Design a protein with these regions (language model features):
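Beta-rich, blade/repeat-based domains predominating
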Residues: 34-50, 79-101, 133-151, 177-194, ...
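Short loop/turn segments that connect beta-strands within beta-propeller blades
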Residues: 64-68, 121-126, 165-169, 208-213, ...
Length: 313
């Protein structure tokens, strides 16, 4: 978005293909996003190294492995109902691309536009299904998937986490808590623990559970402040990549117990809501959101939109 232990069965985040390796001798190449006024949001990658990017206009862009251009791949149409996108997640294990869809925030909403999660075939881009959030304030933000195929979806405005089991026809409420208002990124560690961040509270938290039920949050003590945390993506073990939109940077988040060490790995970005990695190469989106909200910039040309590539330490 611009601007606690989970016990029981072991959960594995089906996301961010890290199977493709990149040697340190290779210079990371930025990727240009085709089009104007794209304003990308989330970014994800599959095991083959293909990269997928969401946008405020509802188009999903794809850059094939090794390409320096991301092209429109899934466009809004009457069948898929795409309007404006936040989180996207490549789920290799189940052959699904997940996408958080919302009514446009920079103009009137089309009739019937709702917040919810949509699924597409990861290989072909064919639309599969839509799962709308219940009525009320809502903003679908990001997704993580368990080893059994159950998806967990964050709702920033409503302070909720929904789940969707394989074969289900509608979302189930996993958690609702005033403390969850502002929830943004979601990811699992190597041992199946669920972590989230909160874009409004500037926190990283562990989700606690009593059996199958949500049991609250543990706010981690951070080694330094963070500013508007957004995407949260697993690397390995208890290490994550985190994008900070207002902070204009990407960091490592290394968790040990109730503490987390924050280490900057890429700075100087232009409002960076999304991050993924392919092997040792990180990729971050630049949303350039000032061109959406600043009256002095709204009619100005934001220039090209670039996915920034950088070597991970």
């Amino acid at each position: 978005m611009f601007v606690t232990r989970l016990a029981g069965a072991t959960l594995v985040l089906a996301t961010l293909g890290g199977c493709t390796t990149v040697t340190s001798a290779q210079a990371p190449a930025d990727i240009a996003i085709e089009g104007s006024r794209v304003h990308p949001e989330s970014i994800t990658s599959d095991g083959a190294g293909n990269i997928y990017v969401s946008s405020v206009g509802g188009t999903i862009y794809r850059a094939l492995a090794g390409s320096r251009k991301a092209e429109p791949w899934i466009r809004p149409d009457a069948a898929n109902g795409l309007t404006s996108l936040f989180g996207v997640l490549a789920d290799d294990a189940h052959g699904v691309l997940w996408a958080c869809n919302n009514p446009p925030f920079d103009g009137p909403a089309p009739a019937g536009a709702t917040s919810g999660v949509k699924t597409f075939d990861l290989a072909t881009g064919a639309f599969k299904a839509s799962f709308d959030f219940p009525a009320g304030p809502a903003a679908c933000n990001d997704i993580a998937v368990a080893a059994d195929g159950t998806a967990f979806v964050t709702d920033t405005a409503g302070g909720r986490i929904f789940s969707l089991t394989p074969g289900a026809s509608e979302l189930a409420l996993f958690a609702a808590d005033p403390a969850l208002v502002g929830i943004d990124g979601i990811a699992f560690s190597g041992d199946g623990t669920m972590y989230i961040n909160n874009v409004r509270q500037h926190t990283v938290q562990r989700v606690d559970r009593n059996g199958a039920a949500y049991a609250g949050l543990t706010t981690l003590a951070l080694s330094e402040p963070i500013n508007g945390p957004d995407a949260l993506r697993p690397v390995s073990g208890n290490r994550f990549l985190q994008a900070e939109g207002p902070g204009n940077r990407v960091t490592y988040v290394d968790i040990k117990g109730d503490n987390a060490v924050i280490t900057a790995v890429k700075t100087g970005l232009d409002s960076s809501p999304g991050v993924t990695h392919v092997g040792r190469i990180g990729y971050a989106t630049e949303g350039k959101i000032n061109y959406l909200f600043d009256p002095a910039l709204r009619d100005k040309d934001p220039g090209p939109f670039i996915i920034r590539a950088f070597l991970l330490p």
